[in-house]
């Protein structure tokens, strides 16, 4: 018999129905379930695929550089970053005739182009790139790295160069190398780039391979380093009148602690950033020597974990047994990695706008909005993935004997208390927040806005004041001019920080009021409910009172027939599926809040947000409806404009989103009947019946249909909001 897809599963390959194709795609990356898999091959396959992943990333970033160099306007943007619109790439085939060509010919280009809202122009400019040649050089270098990655992946699939399982399970060596090598050395190298190339570039010096050995980054060279006079590197920083990219107002300092923002670029001081990376490098280089390997110095992680037993004896055996549990479970390791990466991605979203690191990016409002939204959605998907793999760990890898009475076992033992507390928190937040919004809605509807319940977020305002925000009048810690912390830091970093935090032209510690109080609690509701669903899915993954043998059914099962009295929708996969809807919903509220508050700040009418955000109709009318008007007007009797493409994407996003419900509401029987009718018609239609297929068409399984529905819902949801966000922001601010 000819080899059929999927090669990794003979059982599936012999399936006579279309289930073969869909189940084959669904399990292609579940290496553990493949025929003939061994632990060694599993680790080697994953290791080799990482190189392929790197190759794709390098190819993609190379493409960004290449297209901007070829079709962009980087060199003219560099001359005037605040007024020239950065071009991402040309549009090859602008449909809809001459009006489209005219609408999309912008940014000083000769033909139709797409504008870049990714921030790459600001990033490349900040790190010292200035010409198209620089961009081409970078693109070629990344292409080279991509090729090297592919070769490395192939190389490590050859029998002689396949690492052994013991190599993959050497946790101490891996941690040391990742901490010192990946984080430490790369941070040190980045500090070097900033000091040798980017900082001179910001002062009008063009440093490249041909002259970087001759241009001293600091007038005194390495002298202060070797004589211990490190403070010399911080003396004579750039002045507040410094023009970025020129020597006007420039200083000579390379490692500073100024605090606050560069007045012209509204971004963090480049010398502060270099100092930060040097400190990070030092910490990680030290951290990479913490764990004991062949050299007999440092800690054994197993010893550390086994010693972590709570004193008093009432909290069980602590971390005993965790080392082998984690080290032998790829799902546990992936869960930890995804949880960490999810948190850091969300923190990136929060910090990119509040503490912008790239020159002039703070004044590019559409880019700010796009980057915040982009990173929050990615964080959401990564975090839900962490719980998915945590649940798979409990089903496939958890060994009760090995983890007796340790923290994992105790989580399972106390799951009812954990889940019910989360449930209580979600119910409390939901009913109270909705109650306040609905009450305020009714008061406005009846023309008595003064009867709204408006709660000042005094605790959050107090925290902002403690960090130096003076407008609330709390006079506490850094907002108190007589405090010891204020006086101690006055000559170091505080002037820049206090100026920044009390200046209303940036997004640092925004002034908050009753509208913020309400939406924060709405977001808290979303976060707690998403967490509740995910935690319940993972803690009940092995079994529950309703279905004690659940782990025997695997991660995703539809149900165990009608005889068990309701075993549908309780697999760990179903919890993940439900949680993704809540995650999207929550991030919707987060991005709505961020965007509306910033639009009113940028337009100088912040009172609109303050007055309209305290009741639901305000959100619907003054945020969603008011800002979608440009989209709905993308096509009109007078032809088209540069927002037309977003108007189309807005419509298309709604279409994709709505298609999701078709899969989520109609299940197998409906589709099976429809398929059989269509197959009957096909076989009796002349010409059409010349085309035959080998696999008998059958409907998707319940779980697969849910996945397809969820995918359409998610993609449509994000497409729709992306179009709304970019069009409403760029329509106002260009």
UniProtKB/Swiss-Prot annotation:
The keyword Nucleus does not apply. One of its GO terms (cellular component) is photosystem I. The chain crosses the membrane at residues 46-69, 135-158, 175-199, 273-291, 330-353, 369-395, 417-439, 517-535, 575-596, 643-665, 707-727. [4Fe-4S] cluster binds at residues 559, 568. The keyword DNA damage does not apply. The PsaA/B heterodimer binds the P700 chlorophyll special pair and subsequent electron acceptors. PSI consists of a core antenna complex that captures photons, and an electron transfer chain that converts photonic excitation into a charge separation. The eukaryotic PSI reaction center is composed of at least 11 subunits. Belongs to the PsaA/PsaB family. HAMAP family: PSI_PsaB. This is Photosystem I P700 chlorophyll a apoprotein A2. It comes from Jasminum nudiflorum.
């Amino acid at each position: 018999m000819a080899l059929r897809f999927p090669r990794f599963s003979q059982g599936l390959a012999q399936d006579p129905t279309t289930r073969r194709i869909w189940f084959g795609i669904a399990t292609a990356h579940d290496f553990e379930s493949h025929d003939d898999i061994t632990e060694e091959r599993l680790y080697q396959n994953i290791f080799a695929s990482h190189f392929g992943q790197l190759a794709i990333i390098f190819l993609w970033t190379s493409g960004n550089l290449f297209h901007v160099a070829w079709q962009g306007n980087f060199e003219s943007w560099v001359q005037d970053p605040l007024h020239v619109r950065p071009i991402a790439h040309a549009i090859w085939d602008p449909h809809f005739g001459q009006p489209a060509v005219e609408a999309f010919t912008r940014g000083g280009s000769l033909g139709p182009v797409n504008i870049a809202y990714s921030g790459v122009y600001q990033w490349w400019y900040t790190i010292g790139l200035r010409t198209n040649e620089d961009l081409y050089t970078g693109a070629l270098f990344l292409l080279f790295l991509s090729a090297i990655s592919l070769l490395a992946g192939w190389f490590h699939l050859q029998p002689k160069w396949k690492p052994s399982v013991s190599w993959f399970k050497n946790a101490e060596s891996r941690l040391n190398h990742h901490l010192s090598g990946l984080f430490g050395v790369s941070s040190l190298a980045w500090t070097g780039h900033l000091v040798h190339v980017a900082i001179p570039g910001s002062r009008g010096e063009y440093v490249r391979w041909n002259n970087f050995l001759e241009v001293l980054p600091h007038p005194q060279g390495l002298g202060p380093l070797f004589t211990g006079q490190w403070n010399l590197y911080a003396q004579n920083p750039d002045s507040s009148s410094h023009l970025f990219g020129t020597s006007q107002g420039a200083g000579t300092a390379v490692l500073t602690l100024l605090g606050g923002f560069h007045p012209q670029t509204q971004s963090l001081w480049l010398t502060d950033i270099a100092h930060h990376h040097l400190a990070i490098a030092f910490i990680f280089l030290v951290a990479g020597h913490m764990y004991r390997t062949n050299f007999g110095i440092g800690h054994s992680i197993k010893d550390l974990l086994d010693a972590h037993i709570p004193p008093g004896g009432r909290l069980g055996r602590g971390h005993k047994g965790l080392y082998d549990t984690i080290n032998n479970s790829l799902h546990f390791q992936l869960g930890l990695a995804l949880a960490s990466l999810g948190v850091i991605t969300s923190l990136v979203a929060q910090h990119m706008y509040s503490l912008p690191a790239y020159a002039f990016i703070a004044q590019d409002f559409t880019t700010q909005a796009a980057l915040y939204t982009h990173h929050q959605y990615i964080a959401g998907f990564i975090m839900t993935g962490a719980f998915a793999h945590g649940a798979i760990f409990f089903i496939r890898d958890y060994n009760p004997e090995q983890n007796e009475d340790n923290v994992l076992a105790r989580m399972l033992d106390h799951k009812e208390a954990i889940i019910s507390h989360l449930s209580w928190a979600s119910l409390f937040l939901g009913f109270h927040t909705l109650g306040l919004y609905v009450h305020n809605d009714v008061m406005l509807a009846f023309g008595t806005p003064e009867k709204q319940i408006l709660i000042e977020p005094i605790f959050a305002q107090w925290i902002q004041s403690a960090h130096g925000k003076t407008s609330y009048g709390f006079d506490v810690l850094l907002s108190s001019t007589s405090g010891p912390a204020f006086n101690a830091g006055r000559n170091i970093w505080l002037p820049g920080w206090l100026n920044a935090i009390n200046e209303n032209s940036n997004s640092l510690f925004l002034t908050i009021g009753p509208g913020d109080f309400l939406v924060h609690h709405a977001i808290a509701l979303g976060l707690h409910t998403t967490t509740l669903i995910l935690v319940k899915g993972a803690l009940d993954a092995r079994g529950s009172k309703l279905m004690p043998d659940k782990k025997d059914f695997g991660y995703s099962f539809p149900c165990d027939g009608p005889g068990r009295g309701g075993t549908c929708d309780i697999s760990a996969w179903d919890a993940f599926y439900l949680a993704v809807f809540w995650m999207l919903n929550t991030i919707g509220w987060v991005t709505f809040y961020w965007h509306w508050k910033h639009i009113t700040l940028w337009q100088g009418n912040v009172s609109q947000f303050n007055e309209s955000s305290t009741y639901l109709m305000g959100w619907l009318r003054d945020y969603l409806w008011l800002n979608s008007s440009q989209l709905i007007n993308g096509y009109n009797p007078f032809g088209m404009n540069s927002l037309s493409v977003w108007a189309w994407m807005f419509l298309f996003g709604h279409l994709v989103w709505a298609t999701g419900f078709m899969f989520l509401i109609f299940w197998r029987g409906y589709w099976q009947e429809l398929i059989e009718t269509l197959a009957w018609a096909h076989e009796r239609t002349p010409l059409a019946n010349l085309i035959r297929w080998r696999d008998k068409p059958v409907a998707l399984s319940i779980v697969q249909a849910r996945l397809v529905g969820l995918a359409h819902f998610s993609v449509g949801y994000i497409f729709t909001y992306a179009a709304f966000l970019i069009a409403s922001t760029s329509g106002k601010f260009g």
